[in-house]
Regions:
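Exported/periplasmic ABC-transporter solute-binding proteins
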Residues: 26-280
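Bacterial N-terminal signal peptides
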Residues: 11-21
Length: 280
């Protein structure tokens, strides 16, 4: 990163502001962010911490909508940063840079009234593609009757992660009820004893949700760190071209500071090392 040059430019701008328009010297910088609902709890914690660290001189406007929405907003220049819970895709606009900031994982989940200890990869595929539609066909299930399958909408990066890592590249059946956010999916599964869905770790490990093992491996931080659980992906900060100025400073802080790492470790998984940006 162009750290020395950036600091020099910043120093010159501040000096000019002090000389020409003193009142503007303390104007706050606004960084706008939109995108993934899965990463929103993490981004909220990180931006609040950074805002306080900068004594209020950096202000964040954060909105949700889904990973693809954040990516599109960043490409269109509508926001400073797009939050993504999936890696770059061939269909994404050109010129984007994806900066990985943390790892997360996806769990198959059910209602606590129907705790299912484990499903094989074949069972997960059969249920979510609509080939198995009744709980009586699922060993270990206590529920009987039709399976209520829940999914995320097409803009969700968590859907991409689930399909690519736990569904073998297959698509979730169109009969599934689609939820627009992780919070809505979580609430739907909590309320429906016949439900099965998938959630990112922050929402899956919350009270009122039962996680399902995959091929004999529990969906847990320990198994992800050990490399035995498959449903893992990264959260990304996405910018139109290489990040610069205050946006670059924020992303660098997220990727490198001890304070950010501590926040990430609270509910997510830090990157093993600072990885280079992925050019989309």
């Amino acid at each position: 990163m162009r750290r020395p040059r950036r600091r020099l430019i910043a120093a010159l701008v501040v000096t000019a502001a002090l000389v020409v328009v003193p009142a503007l010297a303390y104007a706050a910088t606004t960084i706008s962010i939109s995108g993934a609902t899965a990463s929103f709890p993490l981004i909220e914690l990180l931006t609040n911490r950074y805002h306080n660290l900068k004594s209020g001189k950096v202000v964040f406007k954060v909105s949700q909508g889904g990973a693809s929405v954040g990516i599109s907003d960043a490409a269109a220049g509508k926001v400073s940063i797009g939050d993504s819970s999936r890696p770059p895709a061939a269909t994404d606009p050109t010129g984007l840079v994806f900066y990985p900031i943390a790892k997360y994982f996806v769990c198959v989940v059910t209602n606590p009234a129907n705790p299912v200890a484990n499903l094989t990869a074949a069972q997960v595929a059969q249920i979510f593609t609509g080939k198995v539609r009744n709980w009586s066909q699922v060993s270990g299930a206590t529920a009987t009757g039709p399976i209520d399958v829940y999914s995320r909408t097409s803009v969700a990066g968590v859907l991409t992660t689930f399909q690519n890592t736990l569904l073998g590249g297959s698509k979730v059946s169109s009969v599934a009820t689609q939820e627009a956010s992780e919070g809505l999916m979580q609430n739907a599964v909590k309320k429906d004893p016949s439900a099965i869905g998938f959630l990112s770790d922050y929402f899956a490990l919350a009270k009122g949700i039962s996680t399902v093992g995959y091929n004999g491996t529990g969906c847990s931080v320990a198994n992800v760190v050990a490399g035995t659980y498959l449903g893992v992906s990264d959260f990304y900060e996405v910018t139109k071209g290489p990040a610069s100025g205050p946006v670059e400073a924020f992303i660098y802080w997220v990727q490198s500071s001890a304070a950010a790492k501590k926040i990430i470790q609270s509910n997510w998984i830090p990157l093993g090392k600072i990885e280079p940006a992925v050019q989309g």
